[in-house]
Amino acid sequence: MSTIYQAKSIRTMDPHQPHATHIAIKDRHILAVGTADDIADWQSAWGPLEVNTDFAERTLMPGFIEGHAHMMEGLLWDYHYVGYYDREGPDGTIWPGLKSIDDVVAHLKQIQDTRDDPSEPLIAWGFDPIYFQGRRMSAADLDLVSAECPVAVLHASLHILNANNFIMDAADVKNADNSEFIRRDDSGQPTGEFLGQLGMYMAMRTTNLDLLAAASSPKTLQTFSQVARQTGVTTCTDLANPVPEGAEVAMRETVEKDSFPMRLVVAFQGNSLPPEESVARMQALQDKQSDKLRFSLVKFVADGSIQGFSARLKWPHYYNGAPNGLWYIEPDRLREYLTAFTQAGFQCHVHTNGDECTEVTLDAIEDALRAHPWPDHRHTLQHCQMASRAHFKRMKTLGVGVNLFSNHLYYWGDEHRAITMGPERAGRLDDAGGCLEEGVPLAIHSDAPVTALAPLFTAWCAVNRLSSKGVALGGESEKISVEQALYAITMGAAYSLKMDTEIGSLEVGKRADITILADDPIVVGAMGLKDISVIGTMVDGNVHLNQGRDA
């Protein structure tokens, strides 16, 4: 059916026609955009078009695009949230933040004491010790929860986990060769913290739980899409998935349904196999794609987490004197992978948190492009939180884009000022203003489940640059406008995914992916962005309303 939707305001993100009040949809695409005065012409050209006024008092925008999230957001709600900040679950339940390690232990102990099978692994997530005045969780803390079953607590960054002695013994930590992935105390004894991807794998394999495999299940996908719909996201990424054989088929069976309310862009985890095999696997995935499911990106994680002290920082390194972080992929190996995938014609996204990692990754990209020139590669640095103006200038020259982790400004801004970076470097944390001024394509993200999936909140962070304590990080030159932030969560993200000819703006011929808002973000302004209610979404013109939020 062909339908014209009337709205109070339509913000198109199309510079040719930035504002409208009516949009016509036919065959899953946008047929026309304009005002009430255009309806007669549309009817004459296209035949009868029903006028729907359900959203006549609402604002329509291009469907929000989350350019850096993980399907783990849909899985972790099966486990136990123990983060510092309150968090809304997929069903709307607000889970209160826990303000001390003792509170976390007491909460998990209560769960353990009421479980049907207390021998099963107990998994929690969202924890971050950086908020607790120097105290870190130990294996002995988690032994208070239980010493008779595996207890693992994933940090919010998903780069570190804490474990009890049950897991420590099962992992044979005392005889482990790769000691750099195990945190030790001043006496050299393991504390119960496992660092990085390899360290976390050492711990989790003892639980017989494969979270990466479970993250691709139909149930996880449905939960993931539910969170996306609630926050206005119509296209979301899973930005690092090894995509084992058969996983792509299971994903497609779920995602292709009209009732599934989002598009999914899966980034293949490029270093999950040796370079030649990895390229071959990526090539094999190309004919498994569809309009709603893409395997178009390759992802590499080059360093760790700043607040977890596993990111690679340039001199003077960490403000509190902590040792520099980890290379998740050694620089020479990263160069080898990037060269192989550039030669094969695949866009690469690279996680670079620390500024040393950003610099090394730009070196590797430059070498790859010298060997295999590619005018529109759109390789993208993800997070890239400590990039300087010099880095942005170099990105512009190389044609590299960036997707900044703007939510860090709120959730960890105070800690970066006081502990990890110091005031000067924290002042240019996630410098969206500098990025745009230097001409680098910009997107911004949540990295869900690291922080909550909520593009309007992410936009609010980039515009206002306020920490959770209300401290402003940087000055006006690091901020962006409301309009620029809205562009970053629509067309900016679409560009970073090479999907800007299909989605990201409301213009003729593009997919009918729309976010329905209670209020107009431009009218509401900078401080009110995060509080705008999402009524629902459309994907391919199919309407998906949020319960309890009347159209």
Residue positions per predicted region:
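Short, solvent-exposed loop/turn segments at the edges of secondary structure
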Residues: P18, G74-W77, S259, F295, ...
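Non-cysteine beta-strand/loop elements that form the S-adenosyl-L-methionine
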Residues: K292-S310, V400-Y410
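Divalent metal-binding segments
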Residues: S2-A7, R11, P15-V279, F300, ...
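Acidic (Asp/Glu)-rich catalytic clusters
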Residues: T254-D258, Q283-S290, H372-W374, M395-G399
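Active-site-proximal glycine-rich helix-loop-beta segment
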Residues: H68, G399, D513
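Glycine- and charge-enriched low-complexity intrinsically disordered segments
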Residues: N546-A551
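His/Asp/Glu-enriched, well-ordered alpha-helical/loop segment
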Residues: T339-H349, E356-H379, H383-C384, R389-K393, ...
